[in-house]
């Protein structure tokens, strides 16, 4: 009797249901760790694989159920995490033997943040320089000239105080010199020495300087200076002695 295709598919499905999804070769590799694994049959390995699948399925369902209860109805879909497995082992006595295997992983409180640093693109610096250059080109020349004038005006006030101070000092020194020169005594008539001559130009310059000084002095100061000059003028004693000697001789002749 030939089997139909439907019967073949049903038979294959039964075989798949009876065989575990976990590979038998991996189960045997784990079983060989035990020195007595030589006496284990293939059917025992198959049964162990089925038991492992059922255990894993039950453990995962319990962990997801506990996570759903803790979160409530915030999220419809849940993802299996290590924390959910740890809570399941802690809350159920059936899985206490897994405490040494399933452990809570503590995350560092402060992360260094090095992984967050992102490298700059290669052309980013060049693009920024090109933007700055284009912005400078867009600025008209009139605005640039106004900026230069503003800079000059800002620097001028710093230079003005020094110039004003120098001018004030010069004015004060000139006024002091003019006052001191006005209070000088009248010079005595010095005898003329042969061979020493004074040019007319020097005399004219001195007269002009004296006139300028007299113009700068106030009228009241000028009157005071004239009185001082009169008091300081000393009479020539030689002339007085000659006059007195002439008078004595005339009186002697008359006698």
From Swiss-Prot:
Residues 109-255 are annotated as: Disordered. GO terms for cellular component: CHRAC. Gene3D superfamilies: Histone, subunit A. Residues 171-184 have a biased composition (Low complexity). Signal peptide: none annotated. It is found in: Nucleus. One of its GO terms (molecular function) is protein heterodimerization activity. Keywords: DNA replication, Nucleus. InterPro entries: Histone-fold (IPR009072), Transcr_DNA_Rep_Reg (IPR050568). In eukaryotes there are five DNA polymerases: alpha, beta, gamma, delta, and epsilon which are responsible for different reactions of DNA synthesis. Heterotetramer. Consists of four subunits: POL2, DPB2, DPB3 and DPB4. As accessory component of the DNA polymerase epsilon (DNA polymerase II) participates in chromosomal DNA replication. This is DNA polymerase epsilon subunit C.
């Amino acid at each position: 009797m030939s089997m139909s295709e439907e019967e073949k598919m049903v038979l294959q499905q039964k075989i798949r249901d009876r065989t575990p999804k976990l590979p038998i070769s991996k189960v045997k590799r784990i079983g060989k760790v035990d020195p007595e694994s030589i006496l284990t049959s293939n059917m025992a390995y198959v049964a162990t694989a089925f038991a492992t699948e059922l255990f894993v399925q039950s453990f995962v369902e319990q962990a997801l159920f506990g996570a759903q209860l803790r979160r409530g109805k915030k999220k419809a879909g849940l993802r299996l995490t290590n924390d959910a497995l740890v809570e399941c082992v802690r809350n159920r006595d059936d899985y206490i033997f897994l405490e040494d295997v399933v452990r809570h992983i503590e995350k560092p409180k402060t992360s260094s943040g090095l992984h967050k640093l992102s490298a700059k693109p290669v052309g980013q610096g060049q693009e920024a320089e090109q933007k700055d250059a284009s912005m400078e080109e867009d600025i008209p020349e009139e605005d640039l000239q106004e900026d230069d004038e503003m800079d000059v005006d800002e620097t001028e006030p710093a230079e003005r105080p020094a110039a004003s101070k120098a001018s004030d000092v010069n004015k004060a020194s000139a006024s002091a010199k003019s006052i001191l020169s006005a209070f000088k005594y009248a010079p005595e008539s010095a005898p003329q020495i042969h061979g020493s001559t004074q040019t007319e130009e020097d005399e004219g310059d001195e007269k002009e300087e004296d006139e300028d000084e007299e113009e700068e002095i106030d009228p009241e100061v000028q009157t005071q200076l004239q009185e001082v000059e009169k008091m300081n003028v000393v009479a020539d004693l030689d002339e007085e002695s000659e006059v007195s000697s002439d008078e004595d001789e005339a009186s002697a002749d008359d006698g």
